[in-house]
């Protein structure tokens, strides 16, 4: 049975990684990213029913003497 020739595998694998890196860099460079996303996104706070009502829990150990 002939022996498998693996002398070109390193070159093939390295060139594959280089090609994948270049392809992904080109794909990522075409995306538009916001410079400061904190200024563009506004979080609207919605009050839940238990936040609108006045509620307070008194623990016995926190009561003044």
Swiss-Prot record:
Q: How does it sit in the membrane?
A: Single-pass membrane protein
Fill in the subunit field for this protein: Component of the ATP synthase complex composed at least of ATP5F1A/subunit alpha, ATP5F1B/subunit beta, ATP5MC1/subunit c (homooctomer), MT-ATP6/subunit a, MT-ATP8/subunit 8, ATP5ME/subunit e, ATP5MF/subunit f, ATP5MG/subunit g, ATP5MK/subunit k, ATP5MJ/subunit j, ATP5F1C/subunit gamma, ATP5F1D/subunit delta, ATP5F1E/subunit epsilon, ATP5PF/subunit F6, ATP5PB/subunit b, ATP5PD/subunit d, ATP5PO/subunit OSCP.
Q: Which residues cross the membrane?
A: 8-24
Q: Where in the cell is it found?
A: Mitochondrion membrane
Q: Does the keyword Transferase apply?
A: no
- Tell me the GO molecular function terms: proton transmembrane transporter activity
Q: What is this protein called?
A: ATP synthase F(0) complex subunit 8
According to the entry, what is the taxonomic lineage of the organism? Eukaryota, Metazoa, Chordata, Craniata, Vertebrata
Q: Which residues form a coiled coil?
A: none
The record's principal subcellular location, in a coarse class, is mitochondrion
Positions of modified residues (N6-acetyllysine)? 53, 56
Q: Which InterPro entries match?
A: ATP8_mammal, ATP8_metazoa
Q: Name one GO cellular component term.
A: mitochondrial membrane
Family the entry assigns: Belongs to the ATPase protein 8 family.
In terms of PANTHER family, this protein maps to: ATP SYNTHASE PROTEIN 8 (PTHR13722:SF0)
This protein's UniProt keywords: Acetylation, ATP synthesis, CF(0), Hydrogen ion transport, Ion transport, Membrane, Mitochondrion, Transmembrane, Transmembrane helix, Transport
Q: Which residues carry this modification: N6-succinyllysine?
A: 53
GO terms classed as biological process: proton motive force-driven ATP synthesis
Summarize the protein's role: Subunit 8, of the mitochondrial membrane ATP synthase complex (F(1)F(0) ATP synthase or Complex V) that produces ATP from ADP in the presence of a proton gradient across the membrane which is generated by electron transport complexes of the respiratory chain. ATP synthase complex consist of a soluble F(1) head domain - the catalytic core - and a membrane F(1) domain - the membrane proton channel. These two domains are linked by a central stalk rotating inside the F(1) region and a stationary peripheral stalk.
Organism the protein comes from: Capra ibex ibex
């Amino acid at each position: 049975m002939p022996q498998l020739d693996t002398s070109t595998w390193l070159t093939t694998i390295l060139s594959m990684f280089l090609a994948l890196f270049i392809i992904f860099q080109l794909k990522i460079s075409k995306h538009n990213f916001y410079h400061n996303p904190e200024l563009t996104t506004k979080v609207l706070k919605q009050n839940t029913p238990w936040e609108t009502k006045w509620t307070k829990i008194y623990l016995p150990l926190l009561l003044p003497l």
